[in-house]
Amino acid sequence: MRVLGLMSGTSADGIDAVLVDFTGDPSRPKWQILNTFSYEYPSSIREKIIQVGQGLKISSKDWLELAEEITELNAFAARTCDPDSTAEVVGCHGQTLFHRSVKKSKRGGSLQILLGPLLANLLDQIVIYDFRSKDIASGGHGAPLVALVDEALVGRLYGWRGVLNLGGIANLTIIPPKTGIDKTSQCLGWDCGPANSLVDLAVKESTNSSLTFDENGSLASLGIPKLEIIDKWLRDPFFYLEPPRSTGREQFGFQYLQKRKKELGDISKEDLISTLTTFTASIISQDLDNLFKLKQIRLIELLVAGGGSKNLFLMRQLQKQCCGVHVRPIHEIGVPSQYREALVFATLSWWNFLGKKVHPKYITGANKPILYGVRVDP
């Protein structure tokens, strides 16, 4: 079955589209990517998305027009990736504007902006969208949803395997081995903390918007990370919350960056970017250490996806800090890093079409099996 997946992440840099053909057992399918397309948001839209997500007040008219524009851009990406409309289903995540983590006395919340019925009619195809609401209504965090699909897409090894996504936010999937006493264990997943969100903001600020991200980690590699400050940052109570755990740009965004910059004082932009990038690697390393302390789980391999996998300095830091773990980009096993999340939502859309529910208890914390997404016919 052909499915088109559309994804725009917390980095808000654009839309990734993937056309994929699924066959076989939905729990461990064979899949083949037929085409991909990436659309970069105009800077005006990206800025508005980030600003609205961090509290900018806009009128109802502006809300509607932003939703329409994002929907129309997703339609453009879909048509470009699948010009003959061969997909039986289109799965579209929409653009996250706000995420609220679950608190003891308050349910979580997550807002993705997309007009699903409009997209279905623009494309004249079945659309699956609004993937997080059912999870949140069932007591879950609504994130990280990629962890629900990773085992089906990448499979198991003879030891514990991890999949790390480095988008705006970093999240981890922990996949049990296929043999031995742990083979009946559950897949685990959680949001770790900031990945590219802080670095991208800092790069833009420190270069007067001439750069929007640290390509290949070139700025970070020229600086010296402030390790004693990083050790202090790692004591943030968020990093000690046991999974399920979720977060977003609301927690690790502009205000958080300003606070951390004040603590760092007057340092060069290279040292700032190096410190923030090393901080991300240290968060992952600390999470893996805590995983062993709490559950005696030690990874043999960590597959890295997302924009951060192209950051050579960050990849070196991960290998350095995650001792004994083979760290490598996910594209080495045939999963294209840039399109992994679009592939995930294509898979969830396929499962929705088939009526396949998933129990996310050990990933999002939801209390029952869920059919992810809402179907809209044209």
UniProtKB/Swiss-Prot annotation:
Please give the biological process terms from Gene Ontology that the record holds. 1,6-anhydro-N-acetyl-beta-muramic acid catabolic process; amino sugar metabolic process; peptidoglycan turnover
E.C. code: 2.7.1.170
Which keywords does this chain's UniProt record carry? ATP-binding, Carbohydrate metabolism, Kinase, Nucleotide-binding, Transferase
Q: Name one GO molecular function term.
A: ATP binding
Q: Which residues bind ATP?
A: G9, T10, S11, A12, D13, G14, I15, D16
Gene3D superfamilies in alphabetical order: 3.30.420.40
**Origin: domain of life:** Bacteria
Named in its record, the pathway it takes part in is:
Amino-sugar metabolism; 1,6-anhydro-N-acetylmuramate degradation; Cell wall biogenesis; peptidoglycan recycling
What InterPro entries does the record point to?
Anhydro_N_Ac-Mur_kinase (IPR005338), ATPase_NBD (IPR043129)
Q: Which reaction does it catalyse?
A: 1,6-anhydro-N-acetyl-beta-muramate + ATP + H2O = N-acetyl-D-muramate 6-phosphate + ADP + H(+)
Provide the family line: Belongs to the anhydro-N-acetylmuramic acid kinase family.
Entry's HAMAP family? AnhMurNAc_kinase
Job of this protein: Catalyzes the specific phosphorylation of 1,6-anhydro-N-acetylmuramic acid (anhMurNAc) with the simultaneous cleavage of the 1,6-anhydro ring, generating MurNAc-6-P. Is required for the utilization of anhMurNAc either imported from the medium or derived from its own cell wall murein, and thus plays a role in cell wall recycling.
Q: What is this protein called?
A: Anhydro-N-acetylmuramic acid kinase
Its gene?
Answer: anmK
